[in-house]
Swiss-Prot record:
Location within or outside the cell: Periplasm
Gene Ontology MF terms: poly(beta-D-mannuronate) lyase activity
UniProt-listed InterPro entries: Alginate_lyase, Alginate_lyase_dom, Chondroitin_lyas
Protein name: Alginate lyase
Gene Ontology BP term (one): alginic acid catabolic process
Keywords associated with the record: Lyase, Periplasm, Signal
Binding site for substrate: S63, K64, H136, T137, Y254
Stated family: Belongs to the polysaccharide lyase 5 family.
Role this protein plays: Catalyzes the depolymerization of alginate by cleaving the beta-1,4 glycosidic bond between two adjacent sugar residues via a beta-elimination mechanism. May serve to degrade mislocalized alginate that is trapped in the periplasmic space.
Taxonomic lineage of the native organism: Bacteria, Pseudomonadati, Pseudomonadota, Gammaproteobacteria, Pseudomonadales
Naturally occurring in which organism (per UniProt): Pseudomonas putida (strain GB-1)
Reactions the enzyme catalyzes: Eliminative cleavage of alginate to give oligosaccharides with 4-deoxy-alpha-L-erythro-hex-4-enuronosyl groups at their non-reducing ends and beta-D-mannuronate at their reducing end
Protein EC: 4.2.2.3
Source domain of life: Bacteria
Entry's Gene Ontology cellular component terms: periplasmic space
Amino acid sequence: MTLLKRISSPALLALALFGGAAHAALVPPQGYYEGIEKLKTGDGNFRCEAAPKPYTGALQFRSKYEGSDKARATLNVASEKAFRKSTEDITTLEKGVSKMVGQYMRDGRPAQLDCTLAWLGTWARADALLSTDYNHTGKSMRKWALGSMSGSWLRLKFSHSQPLAAHQAEAEVIEKWFARLAEQTVRDWSDLPLEKINNHSYWAAWSVMATAVATDRRDLFDWAVKEYKVGANQVDDQGFLPNEIKRKQRALAYHNYALPPLAMIASFAQANGVDLRKENNFALQRLGEGVLAGARDPSQFKARTGEKQDMKDLKVDSKYAWLEPWCELYHCVGDTLQRKHGMQPFNSFRLGGDLTRVYDPNAESKK
């Protein structure tokens, strides 16, 4: 099937038409080629749970900020509870796949791989998460889930242990589903006005980038790079993102939340010969440095927003998982490197699992 025949979005069609000559196959950063850490014998008491029920309904979910003002910074406890319940099966899939892939890449037990494939295959055959009846929270769940699944899948697909070699038919079913989800994600998040482009768009672009590499789709890769550039050019001279500053007391937390997808996209682009580090005068570096400074002293964020910053998320080590790709891109030294080492290992299911294993495998694990 040709590239143009596969495309069902005007945004992707334009990129395909003007994308230029043929390219080499897309690849992930080097760490994704790592093999199984140490083959274990026996079942290790691993038990494959039944796959969560595939979510095929309308992607209409309540927002945890329901009833908040335009800053969208005040949590609605009742709405969050309803959101968690209605999305429980999706989140169970995301976390379960990430965990099982991590276990398999550590121990190499076939049951761990078989269970992962069974879960993903069940959802793929049900055409789960593909509803076009969605609200903002619904399309957000779609791209978060896709990034989680594709991010984990990359560790299986590119590992030199070749775990998928004996499962090619099932892998094809799953990857075709990923591609359809990515195409819908492109439709969901394309052509937004600049004032509406924020961390959600960056996370959408990460999910599309991960899927692009998993399925070798240059059109998806180009879309993710394009969205990255929009995000990078939103970073101002002081390292602030105006649309995240709007989050008032949670502005610093949302700047930190914007970094993981941007850093991952830049890292994947770099692996494919596209250097995004200098975009908008090193915007990604500026953004990261601003967040690290703000985590130590949030006064600049308070001055910019007029609000004392909510620091709860900034005290959670895993929220800094972006440091792994970011430090590879910008060669961290000194205090930043020490802070990274102090917080390792970084495990983020929305980024596909154990990023320290991928980017800094020689780091001493503290767990």
